[in-house]
Amino acid sequence: MAGKLFQSWKLYYFFLISFVVFFISTANPVLSADYYISNDGSDGNNGTSISTPWSTITKVNSMMGAFTAGDKILFRRGDTFFGQLTVSKSGLAGNEIIFGSYGTGELPVITGAKSPQNWIVHSGNIYKTTFTDTLSNLYVSGNIMNIARFPNSGWLRTDFGISNTGFNDAALNQVNGYWNGATCRIRTRDWSYEVKTVSNFSSGNVQFSSPVVNALAFDYGYFFDNKLNLLDTEGEFFYDIPNQLLYFYAPGGADPNTLEIQATVSKFNVHLNPGVKFVIIENLHLSHARDKGVEEANGTSITVRNCRISKSDKNGIRLYGTGHRIENNIIEDVLDIGITAQMFDGFINGNTIKRTGLKPGYGGSSWGYIGLRAESATGTQIRYNIIDSSGYTGFRLGKNNIAEYNIIDYSCVILNDGGGIAIDNVDGLQIKNNIIKNSIGNKETAPAANYNLSYGIYFGNTPIKNLIISGNTIAHNRFVGIYVDNTNSLDNIQIRDNVLYNNFWTQIKFTDLSASSYKSSYNTICKGNIFYSLSWKQVGMEHQMFHSLTFSDYGNFDSNYYANPYNEYIIRRMIMPPNYSSKEYRLAEWKSVIGEDLNSSFSQFSFDQYAVTDTLSSNYITNPHFNDTIAGWTTWPSGSSIARVVHPLLDGGSMRIRWNGIGFTENLAISNAFPTTKGSYYQVSMSVVGDQSGDFNVWGRSSLPQVYEMGLRRLYRFETFRRDYSFIFKPDTTDPATTFTTGMKLPDSLFYVDNVHMYKVDVQKIDSTEKSKLFINETSSPQLFSLNGISYKNLDGSNVNGNVIHVPPFSSMILVNDGEILTPVLNLNMLVEGMYDPNSQQTVSDTVRVYLRNINSPFQIVDSAVSVFNTSGFASLDFQNVSDGINYYIHVIHRNSTDTWSNSGGESFSSSVLNYDFTNDSSMTYGNNVIRKGTKFCFYSGDVDKDGAVDLSDLSVIDNLASSFAVGYLNSDLNYDLLTDIADLTIADNNAFNVVTVISP
């Protein structure tokens, strides 16, 4: 019995031990170990403790076969290790092999750079040394040097392309064969640099050893490098591969032996062999890879996290495979692409990618300069990344990935025709709650005729379907906010609840540029968006057609908010050449004519973009008021007519402009000629009314050959009620004989114009981003923003309560300051003797300058403003430097009347407003220095030479001009009938007899 019992216990223990062994062997076949590497170590050590570390990456690579799941290979912080870490072993799920760090201090550096030593003088300031490694780039104190090049700076330009094989530049006058073997770095498209070796040079023709991707054309920039005879400028180097000699002309002509120099030689910092699984790369600084910082192909569950990767020639990280994670890394100063992710079901989260592809010609050949490239990834989540300063596109996306809570700032810094996010081959992609801003567009080395084409979100010309773009803030991009290229395969696109703000051409654009043929309709949904423009040149939305004269129905547009405080025309439709036409719509017209955006709204805020600080000329328009005739004005073509008429809503005479549609595609009404100067500013104002509603253009028309418009046209509206317009015009050409021109394109149009003024002025730009302020929360937590005591309004016009606003994560809010940015306003009533008619109680309008002065001697000027008083004598003037509750003298200056001051003691602003009326009582004027006409008090006329008195010198000026029958807008014309005559002389003579002078404190 005892024997049987013993056998039973023996059998029990056998099975128990077998189970334990089986469990341990399946859970962890070999116990994991930690290995240490330190600059103070030795490769003869066992590496398994901090006190017995290895010292080189070479040793780590040699031991790779011994590593097992769960092992940690740790590099000491603060140390630097040279070489390429080659990972060939896999871990297990939850038991990965980890390559990381230990200790304290800066991340350990795995560098692909060596420091060339033992430099000797080659010639002059050029040094040389033997260098046996293949190198790609040279750095001094962290700054990249140039490969010896021609020209030493700037660019040469192609004259014409020779298909895909080369180009011609007649300026290349070197002997045949001179450029053979050189490298040519050339821009071949807006979006592309290519790098090719010259196989043959002859008589200005450059032939490449292999074809470029993009056929070459006229006026693209290029330079040659990589020849020893080009080494003639500091900061350049040349590497002679056959002879293994490195030549260098150091910055400042310094001795390279005294400098910190790094030559990039290792192809990778970390290379994971194909098929490797379950490996973590963490807490390392990977630097100076000749190709990529981290490279992997077709592996599974590779994680790269908390690393810093810098100065790679091509990619910071490139991972292909399944289940990879790229998280919380800093990738910076990579010459081509920050991250390339061709992965399935991956995660790219929390990375900061800065300054990628910013050295022209040194990035990828034909395609590159990108922050994050993931257009071939599938099922990958891309979240909480920051892309700052990319040579080309910030993100390149496709398939069915999710990109949300990312910040993309400053893209297209080196190239053009791209944007913050570019998409291709989409089926299920979601772009949500990102902040995309400042796509620049660089045309420096592209043909001068090319346009800036920089976008927030850019649709490629590939199949795109089942796409969601929602909740994004897209701002300050130099061309278009969202560019929708409607190919024939575009399907099920949703653009919802985005904020598009201050994108320089249009907030959103729909085009059929890449369609194979006309398609009548698309099922895109565009709803709930804010399209906020900040310039009269910008529109909220544009529809463009290339393939038909009939517009496609680009989708369902509704419940959007359109705003442009500087232009009421917020939607544009264009038929592209050869049958070009363009029409801009106000929202009401868009709704009624097109039938879209029926529940959308338009902002009622309206602002000026400039404040006039000084008027530098008299009115250039010789007949601005049409009191008697339309002299000085002409019209064209034959179907157009102009006539002087009296319109009850305008001020006496006006000019009627009518066109029956005959003679041309539009009519013109043309003023007298006047000089304009490129870059100067001119204030234009006018009053208009129509018998019905319609549109008209205004522009400066040039007299110069091949120059038609002096700057872009402006489109305005005439209605059955009076509208007064004023704007600042900045010509882009100097012209001795510009004309103020209006035009109508719609036949049977008719409107009336009056009070046409054009003055040369000094201006101060009013910051439109402060008037309509965008508050962006770029964090993952709700943020509070102080309003700094400014009274803002919401977009619906309601007041913002309190001094703090709450903005949710990765979102934005636009608030409007319609309080003139707290600009004090003087509402002034004044009349000038010669211009005022007491019978009609109307005056001719004219320009007036007002100084606000200190009330204490010497009465210094505190601020000034310029305005035009209307036919009632009212002018509104904005000031910048005055405060409520402080008394100021009001000093009024008019071109041919005596300067006039407000009454003794001064006046003060209240709530930034001061109302002052010189016309009701003489006591409102300092020294009662006014003349009564009818029931009103007027400033004395006649101080033509502005010397402070109406006297003989003024009479002499008027008499001389009257004798020559002078006409036009002249200071001598005191009653403003455009004729200097006895009537003007009489006014001045009476005031001279009464010794009228300026009376001031």
Model-assigned labels for residue ranges:
Residues 707-735:
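Extracellular carbohydrate recognition and processing domains
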Residues 641-665:
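Short carbohydrate-recognition loop motifs
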Residues 922-931, 944-971, 975-1001:
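Alpha-helical segments with a strong preference for the paired helices of cellulosomal dockerin domains
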Residues 117-119, 123-128, 263-270, 290-292, ...:
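Extracellular beta-strand/beta-solenoid scaffold signature
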Residues 624-626, 670-694, 723-731, 756:
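Extra-cytoplasmic beta-strand recognition segments
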Residues 36-297, 580-616:
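Extracellular polysaccharide-degrading/modifying enzymes targeting complex plant/algal/animal polysaccharides
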Residues 277-288, 300-313, 323-337, 345-359, ...:
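Right-handed parallel beta-helix
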Residues 604-639, 767:
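Extracellular carbohydrate-recognition regions
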